[in-house]
Every structure is written in structure tokens, then in C-alpha cells.
Amino acid sequence: MTWTPWYHHRALQRLEAELSLTTGLAIEIEDFEKATPSSYRLHGITIREPETTHEIARIRKIEHVTEGGEVTILLQQPEIQAAELKGIWQLLHQRFLCRPDLTAMPVRVSANDLTLHSRTGAVTLKDVDAWIVPHENAVEATLACLPANSLNDTPINIMVRRDRSGKRPATRWSLDTRGTTLPCSAIADFLPEMEKLGVNAEFAGTMTWQIEKNHWWIDLGGSRFTNVALDRIFERNSHRLSGTATFEFDRCRIDPHSKRSDISGSIIAKNGQMGRSLLIAANQNCGFEVRLQDRLIDQHGDIPFDLLGLGFNVNNAQINLTGICRNEVGYEGFPTDVALCLDGFPIVFSTPQTLDSLSVLNVVAPNYSVAVPMSDQTDWLMNILIPPSRPMPTNQPRIRSANNWHGGPTISQPQ
């Protein structure tokens, strides 16, 4: 039998059709070689979303070998469009991880210089290795990689586990950066929430989340977000807050379906500004004490600050907020509970009382919000701050002073 150009082209078309049918994607291949019955090479691969035809990925060469009951795949210079990751993940999740017949054989995938393109730029990953390992009632996919500019030799680890042992199958993700920082902007197209942290925000630590039908939870315990732009977080809020912040989570388990929030951590922000309306809201709803310097009382506009330090502890509908400025270097001589300072002077003090979630929601809610402050500005908080199912007992009444405060009444009767 002679291998003619016509037959080669026909075989290439058949291969494209088979791969497209299996993956649910539009696969285009410039050329291929079949060296042995158990191996082949693909050249110039382009992967597209089948409905929009948007490019998802481009790969210079793929080497595929099946041997000893295991599949080995080598990708040469793959480039992925981050904007298409969310849709492609959902498709591959349903097509592969949810189908035991397609994950019955172990698979190892290696890639050199994987580039992830996003709206904010490109991130290149090196030493990329992935494994798909089937188990009796589950399948695990593990990815290890390093950012090309990383000084750390320990790879980032990502694991996806599809567990079928329970009453309902569930998919669990886990991410461990193992000392390496990841730019949040690289996955902002995949997780839009990351875009709200700013283009310079970075993540380090561990993250685990599980997805079931109509149920999800996430655990960020041990994680840290740095270089967070507070003005991006508050850009759709009626109050103003700016500065560069670091968020650290000692514990952080959020489970909206079970109405559970167990969060403990801190926020440290420097060189920013806080709107006067936000100060008033913190005073009226959380009992924070405001002591403005004389020169700031007569000025208009936002209040500048050198340091914002706040510890938080969320237990479902109960919240404790504690000023922690004195924990920072150079501020050790400050009194306890200082949450905001300027030019070496404390200007905001936290309250020791336990707050309910509605009090904190009312701080960031617009002035026109109703008793349960649901709005575009607070929607993202409703999964974190669980509204109480009944009125919570109040702490013993106490009056906190607001010396030199001319921004409005510190105590008012309900209208």
C-alpha cells in the first residue's frame, strides 16, 4: 500500500474529526507523523471554541505515546488564552473527569515554556508536569509548574479530584504555591474576582474549593494576598478607600450552602485615603472611635492615612474587628485597638464588642439600603457575612467618645 498525499490529507482530516469529537473542541492540525502503531506526532495545532471559533490554545508540536498501559504526552511551546479557560475547563470537566471510561488509563503530560496570555499580559511557566491517575471511585489530575521568573525551585502544585464514592459525585480543587507567589492577574479572566484585586496583586499559600451540584465551598486558610489595590475593591462602592494592602488568612472556610463562615485573619494597608462617609459608617455601625486631628477637621475631601491595621474574626453571623497597628514595626508604642493612624497619631480605634454581620454590611452599604443591606456593593459579601436568623443579643451599652469629630452626629435616633 502506498502512502499518497491524498491519503495523508484524508487521514489528517479523520484525526482532526476524532479529536474534535472526543474533546468537544475544534481541533486544527497542520501536519502529523505516525512513527509506530502506538505513537504519533502532531505539528501546528490550534484549538478553538467550537461555537465562537475563538482561539483557546496554540501548540507547536505534540508527541503522543501509548506504552505499558500508560499514555505519555509532550507539548512543545503551548500558548493558552486565559479568557477561554473558564469555558474550556467546564467542557473538559464534563467530557473527561466525569467520564470514567475516558480516564481509565494513567496519563502523563509534560510541557516546556507554557505561556498564559491574559488582558494584562503574559505569564510563562516552566517545568510543567501533569498526571491523571485513575482510582477505584475517583480520578485525580495533578499539575506541577514554576513561573519562569521564579527564584524558588519548589514547583507550584495544583490538584483536581473527582470523587464518586459519596452519595453525589463532587469535584475538589486544591492549590499550594509552596512559597512561590502567583500574579492574580494571570487568572483574572478565569476567576473574575481576582481582577478586583488590581493588576499588581499576588497570591501565595493554599487554596481548596469543592464544587457539587448546587453547592460549593472554599478554604483559604494559610493564604496571603499582597499588593492588593483597595480602590479597585471599592470602585463600585458608595464609599472611598485606597491604598496598597496585604490580606492574610489564618483560617478561612466559606460554605454558603451550609451558612457557615469561619474566618480569622488581618488586613494591613499603607499610604492610602479613606472617605469621610466610610469613617462615619464605621463609627455609627461598628462603634469605632474617631479622633481626627484639628487640621483635618476643617479640610474637605478624604482622610489620608499612613497605616490601616485591622484583625478580623468571623464566626458565621458574629464578627470581631480589632485594630492591630501596634503590631507593625515602628508602631509598637501605640495603644491597643488602633486601626488607623496618620503622621504618628492614632485617629481610629476599634471596639472590643462582638458585632453582627448586618453591622459590617451596613458599613459598606450605600446610604439608601434597607434593613438587610443587599445591593451591588454588598452582593459579594453576602456569601461571607451570614445574616443572623434572629436578632442577636446586644453587648452592654456603652458610649465611645469621638473627640474633635465634626463629620456629623456620632449617636442618632432611628428615623
Q: How should these model regions be labeled?
A:
Residues 83-91:
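Extended, regular secondary-structure scaffolds
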Residues 2-84:
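Terminal hydrophobic membrane-targeting helix
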Residues 39, 70, 106-108, 246:
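Detector for repetitive beta-architecture
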Residues 71-73, 120-124, 258-260:
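Short acidic, Gly/Pro-enriched loop/turn segments at secondary-structure junctions
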Residues 39, 44-46, 76-81, 142-391:
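Small-residue helix/turn framework positions
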Residues 61-64, 92-184, 338-340:
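Elongated, acidic membrane-bridging lipid-handling scaffolds
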Residues 398-415:
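Long, low-complexity, intrinsically disordered segments
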Residues 25, 55-57, 123-125, 200, ...:
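Short solvent-exposed loop/turn micro-motifs enriched in small/polar/acidic residues
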